[in-house]
């Protein structure tokens, strides 16, 4: 692979992985977590890691094009994943939620773009933790 800025890419990757390590010190996914809890945790964990990898520039970055182009498709996949009842397919959804091409990682992208849409509430969202993350989305889907 060739990158225009290998040093910048390496820095983003280090920030991303460090974010995971720090998040996991405070928040852990229980072994008994339900499938829906696992998806919510992935949105929280990957969302924060992907957001933080963007760096401090994200505060002044206009992400409206990202949101317009990628948020609804990510949420649509998240909705499909949450309504899946077949256990073997659930394993596939959990895998696809965080792997593959960047914009196809629907849990990571849904979480990141949700956070970008709520930059003024990041501290509150973080302190509430994964169990309340994206409540308007998860709670609505869980009721249906």
Q: Language-model features: where?
A:
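Short pre-active-site segment immediately N-terminal to the catalytic Zn-binding motif
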Residues: 1-14
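Short consensus segments that form the blades of beta-propeller domains
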Residues: 2-3, 39-40, 105
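Short, hydrophobic/aromatic alpha-helical segments in well-folded domains
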Residues: 9-10, 52, 114
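Active-site His/Glu-centered metal-binding helix of metallohydrolases
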Residues: 14-23, 48
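A structural signal for well-ordered alpha-helical segments within the folded catalytic domains
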Residues: 16, 43-47, 109-113
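Active-site-adjacent bridging/hinge elements
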Residues: 22-26, 88-91
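Post-HExxH zinc-binding segment in Zn-dependent metallohydrolases
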Residues: 26-83
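Pan-zinc metallopeptidase signature
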Residues: 66-144
């Amino acid at each position: 692979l060739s990158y225009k800025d290998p040093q910048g890419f390496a820095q983003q990757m280090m920030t991303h992985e460090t974010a995971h390590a720090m998040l996991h010190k405070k928040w852990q996914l229980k072994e008994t977590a339900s499938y829906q809890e696992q998806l919510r945790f992935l949105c929280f964990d990957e969302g924060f890691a992907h957001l933080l990898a963007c760096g401090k520039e994200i505060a002044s970055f206009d992400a409206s094009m990202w949101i317009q182009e990628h948020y609804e498709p990510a949420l649509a996949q998240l909705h499909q994943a949450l309504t899946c009842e077949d256990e073997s397919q659930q394993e596939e959804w959990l895998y696809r939620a965080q792997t593959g091409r960047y914009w196809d990682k629907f849990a990571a992208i849904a979480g990141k773009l949700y956070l970008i849409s709520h930059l003024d509430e990041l501290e509150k969202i973080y302190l509430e933790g994964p169990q309340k993350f994206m409540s308007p989305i998860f709670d609505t889907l869980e009721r249906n």
